[in-house]
């Protein structure tokens, strides 16, 4: 997997995960289980850059790939645990340790340079 949104959309398609662009009132992105499949919604009008689209889509794929879902009644610690799992999946796929080591060895040593190199947001 590379760090371009088109590659992430292709990954989702191979995994039978529906990805749709939908305007939403509050959320920028969300994912839901649908029986034996998953669906992701992204609000393209809230995505300010390719890096943000990449990070949001990877995060939602992380929910799908780890089965980390919760409902509105879940306790905050449960929600955070599921969000952390999705973040961990996204980070491991967007910034593999070996590639991070190579980037640092090649001179990408600060957060802005690394985020640009990996096409991810700084946060």
Predicted regions: what is each one?
Residues 1-123:
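Active-site hotspot residues in diverse enzymes, especially metal/ion-binding acidic/histidine motifs
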